[in-house]
Amino acid sequence: MPWKQPHRVVRRSVLRYILRAMSESKAMILGCAGRSLTRDEARFYRGEAPWGFIVFSRNLSEPEQIHDLVAAMRDCVGRPDAPVFIDQEGGRVQRLRPPLAPNYPSAAALGALYGDDKAAGLRAAWLLSRLHAIDLGRYGITANCLPVLDVPVEGANDVIGNRAYGRTATQVAALGRAAADGLMAGGLLPVMKHVPGHGRAQADTHLALPTVDTSLADLQRQDFAPFRELADLPIAMTAHVIYSAIDPRNPATTSGKVIEEIIRREIGFDGLLMSDDSSMKALSGDFSMRAAAILDAGCDLVLHCNGDMDEMRAIAARTRPLEGVALERARRALASASLSDHTKEDDLRAEFADYLGALVA
C-alpha cells in the first residue's frame, strides 16, 4: 500500500533526529529557578543541551503553566523525548500537591498495610504508582524518582524514615518492585534510590556527609539486597554516603570503587546511573570539580536541582557529552517506558480508596 511509505520515511527521519539529538546532549539533568524559563536559562539550555530536566514545587503552580514549562524545556534542547524528572513519592516528599494532584500516603503506610495483608500491600503500592503516572503524565512529566529502596535502621537520621517501605530488605524489595511496575505500566520511568543504600546514614545529606561504618557482610545482607532484586530497572540514583568498609574517603556518588565493585558488579545494575543532587552539602569542592568527580567515578549523569545559574554553568563546564555506554544506557532507559495498562482512572482511584482512601486528601 504505497500511501504507507511516506509515513515510514517520516518515522525513520524522526527516529534519526532523536538519536542524533540525544548523542549531542551533555550528561546532566538540570532544574530551573521558577515557573517559566528566563531568557538566560533558555539560552543556557540551548547552548549546553542537558539530557534531561527536573522540576520541584517551586516550578509548579497550575496545569497550563506546567505544560508550558515542560514544553519550553524540551524545545530548548530540540528533543520531544527529553525526560523530565520529579520526586513524587507520597507522604512528605511530594512536589505536586492539591489541586494539581492528591496528597497521597507515605511508603510507610504501604508497609503497614503489607504487614497486615501482603497481597493488599503490594496491590496498593502498584495502584499508588499507577496513579502517580496518571498525575504526572498529564503534565508531560515522564520520570519519577521512585521507588525508595533504602532500609532504615534504628537510630538513623530521619531523612529516609517513613519514606521507606519497611525495615526489612525483603519487604522493601517487594513493595519497591510493585511501585516500579505501577509507574512503568503507566508509561513512566522509575528511578530506584539511593543506591547502594541510605538507610544507615546518621546525617541528612542535604546538610552533611554521613559515614556508615557497617561491615561489608551486613551491607550485602541488608542494604544492597533490595537494589540487587531490582537491578533490572532502567535508572538508579546514587547515595551521597561514605561506606568505610568499601571506600573510607569518598561517598558512593564519587567513588569509583563503590560504583564499579558494588553497584555494577555486586548489585548487578547495568542501567543508567545518575547522581543524587550535586548541590547537596554532602559533596564538597566547587561545582565544576563535583561534576568531574561524579562522572570520573562512573556515574552516567550529573543531577543538579536548585536552578542556580552560576552553579549550573560550573557543572556544565566539566560535564562531557553523553556518549558510549552511557548513551546506550540512556537510550535503553527511554525505550523501556511504554504505557501498558489502560484501566480507567476512576476505577484505579476507587480501588486504591478501598485500601488507603482514608489517607488521601
Where are these regions (language model features)?
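Glycine-rich, aromatic-flanked loop segments that form ligand/cofactor-binding clefts
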Residues: 77-105, 125-151, 172, 180-196
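Glycine-rich anion/phosphate-binding loops
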Residues: 61-68, 115-134, 169-174, 219-220
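A charged helix-plus-loop insertion that forms the helical arch/lid used to bind
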Residues: 100-119, 164-166
